[in-house]
Structure formats: structure tokens, C-alpha cells
Amino acid sequence: MQLDWKINEKTVVQPDLMIICNDFVTAFLEFPPSIVIEILSPSTSYKDRHEKYELYQEQQVKYYIIIDPDFNKIEIYELAENGYHPVAVTPNKFEFLLENKCTISVDFDGVFDK
């Protein structure tokens, strides 16, 4: 299901994948998701690495994951007091501790063909 995240009247984004640990009833998301995942392509790489990185950081998205299929690389960033910090690069597995007792364990082993 595609879902828009309406940040404000002028800014609406549609990440490749979002994980949301809170309920919502509108046709679009009006609060930051817990995790945003963007899959890079040549046409989106700059925007995903720079513009969306800054936007998601400003909007307090706890985890931002960038998947780069050209280099078989997964980058996981976690929000801290002073911005995003890298916490893992191409892990086999990673556990995300989120709000509302929401914990997600992800097995990244099958993301890329071996």
C-alpha cells in the first residue's frame, strides 16, 4: 500500500517503505514514522542521501535506512540528540527498539542476491 506522509501543506513525501508503530485514521500519515527505508537508484540517490536525510532528521524519524543495490550496501542511521549517527552497515540482522513497546527484528541476509 502506498502511503503519503504529509509533513506540512507544502511538503508531502512517499518513502519506499515506512514502519509505523502508532495507529492513524487519515488517508495519509500526519506524524513521523518510526523507520523510513529508501532504496537508491541513479535518479534518486542524491535526493535520498542528502535532501531526505536532512528532512527525516528534522522530522525526528528514529531510524533511516538507505539500501544501495549497486553496492550491495545497507546503511542504518539512528537519531540521537545531535542528529543521525550510523549504527550499522550491511548487517546480517538488526533489532530496532521503537516507541510503544514496538520492537522489530529484521533479517537483512536475503536483501541482495549472493
Residue spans of the language-model regions?
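C-terminal interaction segment
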Residues: 1-59, 66-114
